[in-house]
């Protein structure tokens, strides 16, 4: 039995009532849970001997607003630069019948030497998730970053302030509906002799079409999905 098979067996036995989905692909195990079950699940994952996830190595937000929309599709290899699109696409490549936003946690057990991805989807109308700062101190800046870039609130965080954007920044720049050129630009006004903020005068346009292609590293090696 591999480490992942052992982990999956224990997850199904101990957390079946708290997780909504469990998948294994490309040597990585992922579970999904509801927002209200996040803290019970995380406590079990940290404290149970068979899991022993003592480190939170990453936490991020995801916006699925335009997920599956694409301009071109190609089977060309991904390791040798971009290629021309071969066929104009009109329909979605993938459909996600879940809320727009998700929070993803990556856990590591230094004792058991295994990893786990935990994902939960959050309703756009109620972007509030319990903080896990009291379980892993590394969550502090991770949660601040997710708040800054996506607008996801973490209930119970000790200091939920923006981390990367400027003072007075409006909006959340990693959201898919945030314009690539931004909302405002900063420049020095020689007449006023000071730095001012003004609306951007760049016209938004697509210079590189959105491409969805299979990763050639896994083509012909589908058996590795369940390792």
From Swiss-Prot:
- For this protein, the Enzyme Commission number is 7.1.1.-
Localization = Cell inner membrane
Q: Which InterPro entries match?
A: NADH_DH_suC, NADH_quin_OxRdtase_su_C/D-like, NADH_UbQ_OxRdtase_30kDa_su, NADH_UbQ_OxRdtase_CS
Which PROSITE patterns does the protein's record reference? COMPLEX1_30K
Q: Which domain of life is it from?
A: Bacteria
Q: How does it sit in the membrane?
A: Peripheral membrane protein
Catalytic activity field: a quinone + NADH + 5 H(+)(in) = a quinol + NAD(+) + 4 H(+)(out)
Q: Which GO terms describe its molecular function?
A: NADH dehydrogenase (ubiquinone) activity; NADH:ubiquinone reductase (non-electrogenic) activity; quinone binding
Q: Does the keyword Repressor apply?
A: no
Question: Mainly resides where?
Answer: membrane
The residue range of the signal peptide is: none
Quaternary context: NDH-1 is composed of 14 different subunits. Subunits NuoB, C, D, E, F, and G constitute the peripheral sector of the complex.
Family from the record: Belongs to the complex I 30 kDa subunit family.
Q: What NCBIfam families does the entry give?
A: NuoC_fam, PRK06074.1-1
The protein's name is NADH-quinone oxidoreductase subunit C
